[in-house]
Amino acid sequence: MSDGETAVIQSLAPGPIDGVSYPLKMVYCGQCSMPPEYCDYSGQTDVCRAWATQNAPELLEGLEISDEPAADGDEKKKQKRGGKGSKTGAAAAQAAASGGKKKGGGPQKVTLQREPRGKKSVTVIKGLATFDIDLKVASKLFAQKFACGSSVTGADEIVIQGDVKDDLLDLIPEKWKQVTDEQIDDLGDKKR
């Protein structure tokens, strides 16, 4: 500030302000739980407007809850939870809904493949879900049997840490009778 200017400072005195009734009564939207002046930012403007016209019409007089997109022509985009949906998760839900069978009624086959991961390798099993085998139970069995890590990574895929492909050729038909030796296909090693 320059020497000739003075700032006006209004100090708030402790205690109640004249003309204000206490306790203050705040009204919140019954749909988005925000104050009505912020309903425009909740992403539920049509529902908020319907609630306000039904429950608190006096609030709509001074407010402007817009239904149209912003004035610059850009559409408002609602944020959705969960980010991008994984395709494998959608396929897993579809497989579970259809009883675990693959579409098209193709041949039921279990494939085993060894994949290099750095200096070590993993064994990938695909096709167990076509035989109505619970992948979580199978993964836990493999982890206990081979004393290694095992996880369900896709809709119909189990990854076991280590090269246990030869042992799986014997274990799978022994544990699950519906899978025969002829239905297990050894794909060998995956190239880098």
From Swiss-Prot:
GO terms, molecular function: translation initiation factor activity
CDD domains: DENR_C (cd11607)
Domain called SUI1: residue spans: 117-176
InterPro entries in UniProt: DENR/SUI1_TIF, DENR_C, DENR_eukaryotes, DENR_N, SUI1, SUI1_dom_sf
An example Gene Ontology biological process: formation of translation preinitiation complex
Biased composition (Low complexity): 87-99
Family: Belongs to the DENR family.
Residue numbers spanned by region Disordered: 62-116
Pfam families to which the protein is assigned, alphabetical: DENR_N, SUI1
SUPFAM superfamilies in the cross-refs: eIF1-like (SSF55159)
Protein name as annotated: Density-regulated protein homolog
